From Swiss-Prot:
Family: Belongs to the anti-CBASS protein Acb1 family.
Molecular functions (GO terms): hydrolase activity
Role, per record: Counteracts the host CBASS antiviral system. Phosphodiesterase that enables metal-independent hydrolysis of the host cyclic di- and trinucleotide CBASS signals such as 3'3'-cGAMP, 3'3'cUA, and 3'3'3'-cAAA. Does not cleave cGG or cA4. Besides evasion of the CBASS system, might also enable evasion of the type III CRISPR systems that use cA3 signals.
Lineage: Viruses, Duplodnaviria, Heunggongvirae, Uroviricota, Caudoviricetes
Catalytic residue list: H44, T46, H113, T115
Annotated 3',3'-cGAMP binding sites: Y12, E141, W147
Reactions that this protein is recorded to catalyse: 3',3'-cUAMP + H2O = U[3'-5']pAp[3'] + H(+); 3',3',3'-c-tri-AMP + H2O = A[3'-5']pA[3'-5']pAp[3'] + H(+); 3',3',3'-cAAG + H2O = G[3'-5']pA[3'-5']pAp[3'] + H(+); 3',3',3'-cAAG + H2O = A[3'-5']pG[3'-5']pAp[3'] + H(+)
Protein name as catalogued: Anti-CBASS protein Acb1
Binding-site residues, 3',3'-cUAMP: Y12, E141, W147
Outcome (variant: H113A): Complete loss of catalytic activity
Record bears the keyword Protease: no
Length: 152
């Protein structure tokens, strides 16, 4: 049972992907000549970034969560971030599960995606991508508000 103090730590939940998916994503980064690519071991998809902790139970099992997506560049505080936006009902449902448990979300909408680079500078990328995105596992940990420091 969770105690009151447990709710104040925040919660981060993410999906990690199969070796085959990681191979395909690295090949995509290389073929596009993506500057500052996210390293293989850091590639993930955020499911929940909540300022309150909730009793989220990570899913187990390995299965395809998306078969396609498209590239977008998002303007962020730190520059231009290249993401592969996924058409994933599974990731949307897992996010809604966290919200149903009381998790917070800082944005109007949840957009399932995989970040390919946190800084592509002035470059632009677009287009549809066919990649089998296979879940390896979900994991959860206390929320780190200074997560960007880990990228340096």
């Amino acid at each position: 049972m969770m105690e009151f103090k447990d709710f104040s730590t925040g919660l981060y939940v993410a999906a990690k992907f199969s070796e085959l998916t990681l191979d395909a994503l690295e090949e995509l980064q290389r073929s596009l000549r993506v500057p500052n690519p996210v390293p293989r071991e850091k590639i993930h998809s955020t499911i929940c970034y909540s300022r309150v902790n909730v009793p989220y139970v990570p899913s187990s099992g390995s299965f395809e969560v998306a078969s396609s997506g498209h590239l977008e560049v998002w303007k962020t505080q730190d520059g231009s971030t290249l993401v592969l936006v996924l058409d994933s009902e599974y990731l949307r449902c897992r996010h809604m599960y966290a919200r149903a448990l009381g998790a917070t979300h800082d944005f109007d909408d949840y957009t399932p995606h995989i970040t390919l680079s946190y800084n592509v500078g002035p470059l632009s990328f677009s287009g549809d991508v066919q990649i089998p995105v296979v879940l390896d596992r979900e994991y959860k940990e206390p929320l780190k508000l200074d997560w960007a420091d880990d990228l340096k």
